[in-house]
Curated annotation (Swiss-Prot):
Binding site for FMN: S73, S74, M75, T76, S104, N132, K199, T229, G279, L280, R281, A300, M301
InterPro entries: Aldolase_TIM, FMN-dep_DH, IPdP_isomerase
Reaction catalysed by this enzyme: isopentenyl diphosphate = dimethylallyl diphosphate
Catalytic EC class: isomerase
Descriptive protein name: Isopentenyl-diphosphate delta-isomerase
Functional note: Involved in the biosynthesis of isoprenoids. Catalyzes the 1,3-allylic rearrangement of the homoallylic substrate isopentenyl (IPP) to its allylic isomer, dimethylallyl diphosphate (DMAPP).
Subcellular location: Cytoplasm
Source species of the chain: Nostoc sp. (strain PCC 7120 / SAG 25.82 / UTEX 2576)
């Protein structure tokens, strides 16, 4: 890979700062498209026949045990502010034994001096950590060597390959050559020392797409469905011209709802490790996603908002999420997550 120019590095770093600011200050949530989970309701058990204090929320993902089925979803890195956010999130993940992913590490490949903003293993020695790079970069001179650097930077347990065609269409100078990418993913997965996770960024992965990705060697799927933060709107806010701003508005609600993605992927891949993310905002959403077939659930915006406030705000959020998930299990008469998945207690509303 040729060294990136100073201009390329500066643009990538500026984009990272813009993303944090826009997500926190502007209305960039989906407007009409929801995560789809409101179409489901749990059957209440008035006599659970279990002790709430005995409920077990532990989950195992990619061979590592978590104390709760929560992933602090990929968000940021590459700036001083992002480094502080990642450090706080890593400390939280370590304290509660949650999984965590970081934002795209492309900026640290282009500008190695910001790699420390991603180097969070020292704050989370026991945590399931996911490194992250855009899959499309495999068509832009990234290969195994760059991916190994990204993994080593984080001492990661897995590598997220995020797939974001719509975002790239609207992003200034976006990388839009997706031709032949599946073959390159296949070649990369066959050589990686850790599992690869395919992840969308808020527009969803269908069962048909998941089937192709799994055949290419991907070992886990994060559906990252619609209903939360719209990256079309985010990039529209950053847009440099009227065309891009128009695209951001037109495609603000583009994508498959998260609930639909979960059921679609599970129908074709009953055993693939599956992450539900995309518009999950509380423990009830998490429990519904798991009952639909996900193994763990990822949240980004709630953790980002708390992280910029304080470590105490992060702990308060996590305690509430855990209490909400526990309450769902208690009020459906399920002592653990496996029972919840197989209980049939989640019903689709007519």
């Amino acid at each position: 890979m040729n060294p990136p120019t100073t201009s390329d590095s500066a643009q990538t770093q500026s984009r990272k700062a813009d993303h944090i600011r826009i997500c926190l200050e502007e209305d960039v949530q989906f407007r009409d498209t929801t995560n789809g989970l409101e179409r489901y309701r749990f059957t209440h058990s008035c006599l659970p026949e279990i002790d709430r204090n005995d409920i077990d929320l532990s989950a195992t993902f990619l061979g590592k045990k978590l104390n709760a089925p929560l992933l602090i979803s990929s968000m940021t890195g590459g700036t001083e502010e992002a480094g502080i956010i990642n450090q706080r999130l890593a400390g939280l993940a370590q304290h509660y034994k949650l999984a965590m992913g970081v934002g795209s590490q492309r900026v640290a490949v282009e500008k190695p001096q910001v790699a420390d903003t991603f180097a969070i293993r020292k704050y989370a020695p026991d945590v399931l950590l996911f490194a992250n790079v855009g899959a499309v970069q495999l068509n832009y001179k990234y290969g195994l060597d760059e991916c190994l650097r990204i993994i080593d930077m984080l001492e990661a347990d897995a590598l997220i390959l995020h797939i974001n065609p719509l975002q790239e269409c609207i992003q200034p100078r976006g990388d839009v050559n997706f031709r032949g990418l599946l073959d390159k993913i296949n070649q990369l997965c066959s050589k990686l020392p850790v599992p690869a996770i395919a992840k969308e960024v808020g527009n969803g992965i269908s069962g048909a797409m998941a089937e192709k990705l799994i055949a290419a060697g991907v070992q886990a799927i994060d559906v990252a469905g619609a209903g939360g933060t719209s990256w079309a709107k985010v990039e529209g806010e950053r847009a440099e011209n009227a065309m891009q701003r128009r695209l951001g508005r037109t495609f603000a609600d583009w994508g498959m709802p998260t609930a639909e993605c979960i059921t679609s992927v599970r129908a074709i891949a009953p055993h693939i490790p599956l992450i539900a993310s995309g518009g999950l905002r509380d423990g009830l959403d998490v429990a519904k996603a798991i009952a639909l077939g996900a193994d763990i659930a990822g949240l980004a915006m709630p953790f980002l908002q708390a992280a910029v406030e304080s470590e105490a705000a992060l702990q308060d959020l996590t305690e509430v999420l855990i209490a909400e998930i526990t309450t769902v299990l208690f009020c459906t008469g399920n002592a653990n997550l496996d029972q919840l998945k197989h209980s049939g207690s989640l019903q689709r509303l007519q």
